[in-house]
Amino acid sequence: MSDQVYNSYIQHFNAYEAKALKLIIAEFRKQLRGLKFDNLTFDNAKYVIVLNIDEESLKETIYKVDYTIGKAYGTFIAKQLRKENPIQLKKWRPLPFFNEAFQQFLIQYYAKFGGTLIRSLSETMTAAVVAEISKGTYENETVEQMRDRIYKTVNKRDFYLWQAMRIARTETGFAMNSAKEIAGQTSGVLMQKIWIGRNDGRERSSHVHANGQKVDQDKMFSVGGVKMKYPGDRENGTAKETVNCRCTFGYEAKRDENGGLIFTD
């Protein structure tokens, strides 16, 4: 079961991540081209950059990534659960329950954590530009030379590609797994969750140890001493356990003594 679930997850993940990366690269390009380099000096660089980043535009882009990926994948999972467990199909809650619940989840998530998330992204972008500026201080650049060099550097795709890739991967995992969590919650069927990852040399040791861990649907996984509802759970997890995570989880429906599904309603 775990191999099949993970392979399906990664296939979807790679496709969604590519779409997310395009959106994030376009946003980074727009943000960096909008910086006021004419007013930039060694002393005021950080403040000028922070003040010129359009956090609302950045937030809209990341929300779009989370919503479009989560809605698409969550709908797929909801349909897949019904396909795998066709018994008493009419008792399953209809898909609009998922759509409404996922949208509500994202609205509440961004209301609570959106400011911190976007501020973190803008600070990451600022730090990258400031680090590039500092390179010239050892070469006795004039302010004019520094401005010219920074303008050329930050407008190269390679400058922000790594950051964009990290964000795309993190957001894709968050959107997919949070949507899968909600698809299970709104199904109307009692299930258990199983943490699924790959010990391929790239995975965190804490996630390797979590592989195969099984909990009830309304319970939390214990990963690296942290409680999380699902892989990439930023509400409860730490950056150490969520950034760049490629893990997922699977569902196993609970059954009664006759082998039938157990419905919550």
Please tell me what each predicted stretch does:
Residues 1-158, 252-265:
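N-terminal leader/targeting and assembly helices and adjacent pre-domain segments
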Residues 159-265:
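Acidic, glycine-rich two-metal-ion catalytic cores of nucleic acid-processing enzymes
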